[in-house]
Amino acid sequence: MLWFQGAIPAAIATAKRSGAVFVVFVAGDDEQSTQMAASWEDDKVTEASSNSFVAIKIDTKSEACLQFSQIYPVVCVPSSFFIGDSGIPLEVIAGSVSADELVTRIHKVRQMHLLKSETSVANGSQSESSVSTPSASFEPNNTCENSQSRNAELCEIPPTSDTKSDTATGGESAGHATSSQEPSGCSDQRPAEDLNIRVERLTKKLEERREEKRKEEEQREIKKEIERRKTGKEMLDYKRKQEEELTKRMLEERNREKAEDRAARERIKQQIALDRAERAARFAKTKEEVEAAKAAALLAKQAEMEVKRESYARERSTVARIQFRLPDGSSFTNQFPSDAPLEEARQFAAQTVGNTYGNFSLATMFPRREFTKEDYKKKLLDLELAPSASVVLLPAGRPTASIVHSSSGDIWTLLGTVLYPFLAIWRLISNFLFSNPPPTQTSVRVTSSEPPNPASSSKSEKREPVRKRVLEKRGDDFKKEGKIYRLRTQDDGEDENNTWNGNSTQQM
């Protein structure tokens, strides 16, 4: 269908100028509108409405549809209005119809339009005859004046048959007929009028031909666009079908490969089951022998492991590594046979420390246990001191027989014992008040854990030199670290060089 591309007023003017039927197709977005549009685009409908019809297509949501509905109410969508020259609808198609039905309606509308046009022409001719007859009857005697007035009218008004004729021959014959009836007074004006009429006729014909060519060109463009869209749609359908076929083939190939893999796995499983059955049948007779051999090998392996475990435990239990921790914080280590009595370890400790702590006893801290005289006769292995253990030396009071009385020694010892705390406090206060620079560290060990016992150190020749050095270097009892003073110990010099574990214990 060749739709008019302009606005509604332009389409109405074109229809009136060509004497055609004005067709308005109101379409929407529903399925019926799509079907009706397809019926309008049918070749039969296009051929039937090619002449005497000016069609325009408007959308229900457009402004043109709103203006059109104010004059012609749009009851339903889609709707097709066939409007004649007088503006009265000749036919209204509500809803969607088939292409054949639409062609029938178009023929019917064309017949109605032709009938109305013929009726209007007949009515116009009758009115003209009725007007001319009274004018002739009113003046029967003045024939000359009537003829002159008629000739003047013919000279002033060009014949209507010339302007409405479609062919040049018909116009020329009508012109010759009228010119033969003209009087001699109009003979000089007629050639100029005939030339103007011919120019107008030729101009109209050229315009009609241009319009026809333009319409033909538009129709060809529309057909080309339709063909292009049809070809594009066919290409898309072809590509879609090819993709679907390719996908289908790939899916079938994949399913076939899966089926083959599944069958191959089943065959392998069956073969494995057959092999297992054959092996079971082959080794059924020797199964008990194999199990007995395995049991014997397992027992031998367990016995070997037990022997290795015992030998390892025996090797570990043959040596006992004992760490002796002294009251001043120092320690020393020695190894003993695991079957040696605890008395041997005590004698080694006594030889090492000498008579520094007098009579002492041994004890363990974890678990806390102090060994008695009966324990000294037991083996280190029985006391759970093998393969390694840490033993603490606990000083005790010396026996009375080992004390040698000396009058001068006892007095000075008693005075030193009584005055020692006061001297220590006085030195601490003086150090704080006068803030003397700290002396250099010495490697001499000073026992600060317990005050000297006068009963145990009065006649000890080994401890007298130590006591004298302690009294001479009493100013070294305090160690300054920034603004903090602390008492010195005998291990201050060694603590910085010792190696400590992560749990604040010294490595052995």
From Swiss-Prot:
Induction field: By ER stress-inducing agents such as tunicamycin, thapsigargin, DTT and the calcium ionophore A23187 (at protein level).
Interaction with UBQLN1: annotated span: 1-200
Name this polypeptide is given: UBX domain-containing protein 4
Region (Disordered): 117-196, 440-508
RNA-binding listed as a keyword: no
Pfam families: UBX, UBX7_N
Keyword Transport: no
Compositional bias (Basic and acidic residues): 459-491
Residues on Cytoplasmic side: 1-413, 435-508
Tissue-wise expression: Expressed in many tissues, including heart, brain, placenta, lung, liver, skeletal muscle, kidney and pancreas. Accumulates in Alzheimer disease-afflicted brains (at protein level).
Transmembrane regions listed in the UniProt entry: none
Domain UBX as annotated: residue spans: 315-393
Locations listed in the record: Endoplasmic reticulum membrane; Nucleus envelope
Task performed by this protein: Involved in endoplasmic reticulum-associated protein degradation (ERAD). Acts as a platform to recruit both UBQLN1 and VCP to the ER during ERAD.
Entry membrane topology: Peripheral membrane protein
Bias kind Polar residues: ranges: 117-151, 160-187, 441-458, 498-508
Species the sequence originates in: Homo sapiens
First-listed, main subcellular location of the protein, grouped into a coarse class: endoplasmic reticulum
Gene Ontology CC: one annotated term: nuclear envelope
Subunit architecture: Directly interacts with VCP. Interacts with UBQLN1. Forms a complex with VCP and UBQLN1.
One GO term (biological process): ERAD pathway
Keywords from the named record: Endoplasmic reticulum, Membrane, Nucleus, Phosphoprotein, Unfolded protein response
Domain notes: The UBX domain is required for interaction with VCP. The intramembrane domain also contains the signal for ER targeting.
